[in-house]
Amino acid sequence: AVDDDPDNEYALGSLYDYYHDAGNDSLAQQLRDRMLLSTKTSAQTKATMLRQVIKDSEQAGGDSIPVLSLFDKVIKADPKDVDVAMLKAAYMELKKMPAEQVDTVLLQVLHVAPDNAAARVQLIQSLWKRQRWDDIVKLSKEAVQYNPDEMMFYYFLGMAHYQKNDNDAALDAFRRGVSEINDQSDHDMVSDFYGLMGDILHQKGDNKGAY
């Protein structure tokens, strides 16, 4: 099948599994790299193979250098495959690498796919731990442009402004978030929105508006 169709993903994958299970590491690695560096290989197959690479690496002692090098090669071969970059970020967290390095990968994802909500949430949560309020405001403002119906980004935006003591901007963000409430909205988050709005209005002396 491989001779007839050199890009046959199923056939190449089966051959890779055969060599891998037989302990023929050299041939298995050649096939693995061939598939991972091909733009014709599906994102799902690449993710499965990279998870196997991570598993094998951890069982062999956990040296992250060759794994990260492989990730970089795969990303360079297809920069638009954000799934691989997200998996790299997850691996870096597994290896307890510095948050700033993980953040760099997530920023690369957002450069390619600015509407990737998962990458943006992960990045904001990372920055939150270091109280990087200005960066969070910037990321959240971008988020509501690309994901205007995602309430969590209005929450992040409002809370970051609130932490900066900019209550007017915080109130504006929370009000915009409330306008996105629907039947599927998280009830706890909705409650938080109204509670925070009430606190801000109370601080501003608008006790009527607070209730």
Predicted regions and their residues:
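Alpha-solenoid helical repeat scaffolds
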Residues: A1-G209
